[in-house]
Amino acid sequence: SIRHERPNTESNYKIGIYIRYFNQTKYEDYLSYHKKQFNDTIALCPKWELVDFYIDEGATAPHMESAKEWSRLLQDCMDGKVNLIITQKIGNVSRDMQELTICSRLLAAQNPPIGIYFISEDIFTLASYYTRDLRDTKFFPSEDWEILPDEDPKGLISND
């Protein structure tokens, strides 16, 4: 069975929400509704702080360098403003798996590590980063990656 990998609600996170927005509904205010759902969910986690929403428009994800808001989000990560990215699905970020793999590895290698949580797939990149038996070779460091200990020293992982 597939393990669910989620960020630990007891950890302090500065969150950037990435949305690829393409309204296919009859509702004009769908984006506001979508943002409210994220705000309501984050409000349930007192140690989580919403930094900003990063919204790129379009039905499909471009390559990362073409997504202005994704680039702004990555810059905020590198500047220490965001340490957890939450987005609906992998396909929102990039259509190129190698590009996403490199990006998630670079983020996980930061000090402190920066994770990405993909809601639809229920994948949290730092869970596999810290726990060897959860490792997915498409997204995460290879077996020789030994910078951090195998145990979860900071309580960043919640496995349900």
Where are these regions (language model features)?
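Short, structured surface patches at the beginning of a domain
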Residues: S1-D160
